[in-house]
């Protein structure tokens, strides 16, 4: 049985003129939930990403990195190290594994998430995918490293070449986003990419109908509009990039209400 839909809502109205901070407008998935609920939610969230082609901006960024002569030359003697922060159920990294296998690009993939139950779900999903002999990415998926931890405490022996995040930054407070930008700028050797949502009243209004029509987890009907309310507009990113003293990043609007930030060295 799934928990009841309960959440704290702000007592004063929030407008779309500004971003709602996570503490003002929590998602149901922000609270403590049993593993079965988290697993089912993350499985259906992957369906949302596939339906909305949410991986497309991230894979296009990787194509740009792979097409850079300087980048290829700097890592040609070893696999490209890619870190996905806030990896959730791991569907983005599994999509990247397929991308890399199709292009014969050696990669070393790591997923980092604060929630140990998300890490557990990512491993479970990956074990299933890697057992499919028809899947060209199965060997890469089997070797994805799933780590539980706080990104700001994460200090690997070998720095990542690329740091990615997908639908992660809207879970952070605005000061934490600035800190995350600085962390990526300091740690990513070749570049970094944020794939998140564009704050939109219209998208928030229409989104709840999709889970009902397509049979997705009922929490998604609630959390989708909340995520859109906690999301960003270009002016937000301009301000936070300035606060992080980053001038070389680009802000990119993509289809299906995605707003991304890219940095290639």
Regions from the language model: what does each represent?
Residues 230, 234-265:
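Conserved Class I S-adenosyl-L-methionine
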Residues 164:
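A conserved beta-strand element that flanks and buttresses the S-adenosyl-L-methionine
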Residues 188-197:
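Conserved beta-strand signature within the Rossmann-like core of class I S-adenosyl-L-methionine
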Residues 197-242:
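C-terminal alpha-helical "lid/dimerization" subdomain adjacent to the S-adenosyl-L-methionine
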Residues 28, 35-69:
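Class I SAM-dependent methyltransferase Rossmann-like catalytic core
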Residues 83, 89-132, 140-153:
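Class I SAM-dependent methyltransferase SAM/SAH-binding core
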Residues 172-183:
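A short, conserved alpha-helix within the catalytic core of class I
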Residues 1-31:
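N-terminal auxiliary segments of SAM/dcSAM-dependent transferases
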